[in-house]
Amino acid sequence: MLEGCILPDFGQSKTDVSPSQSRPQSSPNNSVPGAPNRISFAKLREPLEVPGLLDVQTDSFEWLIGSPCWRAAAASRGDLKPVGGLEEVLYELSPIEDFSGSMSLSFSDPRFDEVKAPVEECKDKDMTYAAPLFVTAEFINNNTGEIKSQTVFMGDFPMMTEKGTFIINGTERVVVSQLVRSPGVYFDETIDKSTEKTLHSVKVIPSRGAWLEFDVDKRDTVGVRIDRKRRQPVTVLLKALGWTSEQITERFGFSEIMRSTLEKDNTVGTDEALLDIYRKLRPGEPPTKESAQTLLENLFFKEKRYDLARVGRYKVNKKLGLHAGELITSSTLTEEDVVATIEYLVRLHEGQSTMTVPGGVEVPVETDDIDHFGNRRLRTVGELIQNQIRVGMSRMERVVRERMTTQDVEAITPQTLINIRPVVAAIKEFFGTSQLSQFMDQNNPLSGLTHKRRLSALGPGGLSRERAGLEVRDVHPSHYGRMCPIETPEGPNIGLIGSLSVYARVNPFGFIETPYRKVVDGVVSDEIEYLTADEEDRHVVAQANSPIDEAGRFLEPRVLVRRKAGEVEYVASSEVDYMDVSPRQMVSVATAMIPFLEHDDANRALMGANMQRQAVPLVRSEAPLVGTGMELRAAIDAGHVVVAEKSGVIEEVSADYITVMADDGTRRTYRMRKFARSNHGTCANQSPIVDAGDRVEAGQVIADGPCTENGEMALGKNLLVAIMPWEGHNYEDAIILSNRLVEEDVLTSIHIEEHEIDARDTKLGAEEITRDIPNVSDEVLADLDERGIVRIGAEVRDGDILVGKVTPKGETELTPEERLLRAIFGEKAREVRDTSLKVPHGESGKVIGIRVFSHEDDDELPAGVNELVRVYVAQKRKISDGDKLAGRHGNKGVIGKILPAEDMPFLPDGTPVDIILNTHGVPRRMNVGQILETHLGWVAKSGWKIDVAGGIPDWAVNLPEELLHAAPNQIVSTPVFDGAKEEELQGLLSSTLPNRDGDVMVGGDGKAVLFDGRSGEPFPYPVTVGYMYIMKLHHLVDDKIHARSTGPYSMITQQPLGGKAQFGGQRFGEMECWAMQAYGAAYTLQELLTIKSDDTVGRVKVYEAIVKGENIPEPGIPESFKVLLKELQSLCLNVEVLSSDGAAIELREGEDEDLERAAANLGINLSRNESASIEDLA
């Protein structure tokens, strides 16, 4: 059975710290043993470590399966009887009774067996990483009292990996958390357009069931809509619930509008009110008192049909002040809920600010903001899967009921009643096709981590991008510390998809909480409290950088705080309730990795956060000189580095594994992933960073993965940058690079493509993977082994055969000679065609891996497939013109020119710069952070020493001792909103260490005199020079460049297809045609519109003329013209084509004989329309 938690807990324990904000003397990475010494410019000490970045996924899944880890955490919170997600569904479903109530079936105690195969094997063999789920089913015969109990298998249940992902059919997927409107009661205010009156309405929204809506209209009557049907007076509903007119008058006598509504209501008594409601809900059906009573009961008061869920009941009670302090049990509506809602609405319309409910509780009367995070909650992975299981179980319930009535009572056992197919199908459907189960973004470790922390308002039960307005997409004050205001997509999904903030967590109701330090009587304590958005609205919160002394008292008498709705003001320190735990509290992980974020415009910061996720892993990773302190935790939690589970000594190290002898005497071997292909074709490779004999502590990084160096996230390279125009070659964001980066593989990346082919049974016989391919020369087969599969290490290019395969052709009538051959040689002479797997057009590389699956090896293959072969081809891509590079501040560009290193501008000591960026890329875009990063990068690369002979300079007073001097190549961190200040940067630039010749290259203004590499002359003005962190993005020119000579045509228009995927041509569009016409290039234009496009007859005749060396014939009529005629004729218009002398021209259908003859002679296949794949063209 499965025991323990999903994720080991490495270094995430909370420690109490003093509230003092004195400077920490060691690296901020000190919570992780063996971390690189990155010195920090942070001025504030954070009282709380960053929580586990994958907790939003793992905690939710552990709740679903009810793991021991989750139960222990629930018990520590004081939850005496914690119920897991699966248990909850089984309790809801049980008991399933037959129609007479004589038999029942109950479920309990869900449990899992061991997973069927480890993660790597599942990926390799296209299996699902799953564990068998068993439940205890109990059948009770109420007539005899007989009880039969069995353990029933409920199917294989997909399990979450340690990294918070699922392996479904061999591919790694992520279930994204969904942001939805919470069930509850919502009051709204609108202005009537005709009378300009303020109108109020309220919706009672359940988790499952019919909506109940009340409103006050412009005639000042209170109405109700049940299940979105026609409006009727609210008093009808109250009477249907058993209230008399006297009771209504007694409860609502204070309200003029309720009295007028009662007067206009013509129904008398409960029965008439029930029948009136029934007629509105079921028009056309004969109403009876019983059916009307049952309908109303079922709609709102029966748990099977109506469910507010725990969160809905909590929200209703909180809003209306009901059942204060009582345990929440009922999840249906109550009569008191309905009455209290109506009273709240009436008082709201009358402008009252508070209302006292029957329990004596006074509640504020106000409208709700639907975009407030107090009213939006998260459906995390566990709840999403739980809902899907609930759907499957309810389908199974129907089957069980039917079987109870049809089967022999004596022979019934739980096993015979249960059909698990609907449950298995529902789970499969969710993981395979749901909008929220997504193909994992594995471009680099950060993209995977961000994907798991994504919040989506789209999906089933959510919004659609077409209907979502500006309000729901906008940044809201309640997002602070919960959802990042920066990181969101740029396209049509902007604002609908967000990212969880660094410190945020999800509470049991699904609301996002963020931590604050408690302030008591003006003193900041170490006590941390997590608040939801609506709780936070009731308090006054100070910023994390409000100055405080050693004892935690505010140094200033008036403190800058924020109140409800994001209002900012100064208040006395005694009025402050809470204080932020960290300046980076409001941003997400990717945004927190942008240094000097505080100096960047939000639009550019958004691009910077998004482009970090597109960075390609390079052959050799390099951590940034200027980081933010977030790099280490992000890399560890992303799960691509190898972390020591126990303290001990490294016993053995090789490229493939590391063996650690732990202090407790146990030995553990960690296997490295070597050159594996990620979901996005990038290379995932792990390499050890420890040596044999080294001492390691638990939680220490012992091997780097892709995009990591020494356990820190390393998405790009530190390059020497000059910010200047250069001969116009870096106009419009183009970038000029030094050839050194090409020659030394500085920005080289490895990309791995997977090619797959299978041999199936066809109607004409079995396909065969073989080296014996018809009409293929020996040179082409040189790299194939005896099975017909390419050898590992072979260099291949487009059109080369990777796997030889032949498919039987249709048998034709054999000639006597062929029959003789068949008789002599048997099957050898049968006709087969070449259907080999070839390298697609435009691709090349080296074969690095082959996997063969066949029935002989007991591999699971789809029906009809005999053998399956996968070939992995790796390509080393050097940086080239047209590739896209970017910094971390949204400063992106395409490489316009690669110059020889000797032509690049150089520093006075002869060092040529690596990259030239245009000055125009900064001022208008307002991302000044890139300039500050460039300056600090130079300081970090050069090293510095602050002259303290005459005392510490004013600008360095706040710097700790470790920042007074540093050796060259010292990595530094400047955390967001708490980093290096401009005056500190200026002082450090004046304090940099000289080079080996004793010269300082860059002055105190961050500029250097540069010399032109071509002439040796200095440029007229000093140029900003420094080190910037540059990333190579996934938009590579090799994937985009494309050319076509001949290829597939569209079936209807006979024009070439478009796009690289279809091996299409370049469209000569309307604007291009007009350009040709403007130049009077009539013959060229005619040629483009006919024989180069869709003149089917002319195409072949021209081909024939070229082959024979004859003159090009006259073009014919394009196929698209014939299509136009047909379109017009389909509209019943009689359209004829007339010659110049007015005679009708008949357009012949089909191919003419000349065409057939020419095609046969030239060996052209004219039937090739919309080819199924590019391989067919080779």
Swiss-Prot record:
Residues 1-37 are annotated as: Disordered. Its EC number is 2.7.7.6. Residues 17-33 have a biased composition (Low complexity). CDD domains: RNA_pol_B_RPB2 (cd00653). InterPro entries: DNA-dir_RNA_pol_bsu_ext_1_sf, DNA-dir_RNA_pol_bsu_external_1, DNA-dir_RNA_pol_su2, DNA-dir_RNAP_su2_dom, DNA-dir_RNAP_su2_hyb_sf, RNA_pol_bsu_bac, RNA_pol_bsu_CS, RNA_pol_bsu_protrusion. SUPFAM superfamilies: beta and beta-prime subunits of DNA dependent RNA-polymerase. It catalyses: RNA(n) + a ribonucleoside 5'-triphosphate = RNA(n+1) + diphosphate. One of its GO terms (cellular component) is DNA-directed RNA polymerase complex. It is an enzyme of class 2 (transferase). PROSITE patterns: RNA_POL_BETA. Keywords: DNA-directed RNA polymerase, Nucleotidyltransferase, Transcription, Transferase. GO terms for biological process: DNA-templated transcription. Pfam families: RNA_pol_Rpb2_1 (PF04563), RNA_pol_Rpb2_2 (PF04561), RNA_pol_Rpb2_3 (PF04565), RNA_pol_Rpb2_45 (PF10385), RNA_pol_Rpb2_6 (PF00562), RNA_pol_Rpb2_7 (PF04560). One of its GO terms (molecular function) is DNA-directed RNA polymerase activity. DNA-dependent RNA polymerase catalyzes the transcription of DNA into RNA using the four ribonucleoside triphosphates as substrates. The RNAP catalytic core consists of 2 alpha, 1 beta, 1 beta' and 1 omega subunit. When a sigma factor is associated with the core the holoenzyme is formed, which can initiate transcription. Belongs to the RNA polymerase beta chain family. HAMAP family: RNApol_bact_RpoB. This is DNA-directed RNA polymerase subunit beta. The gene is rpoB.
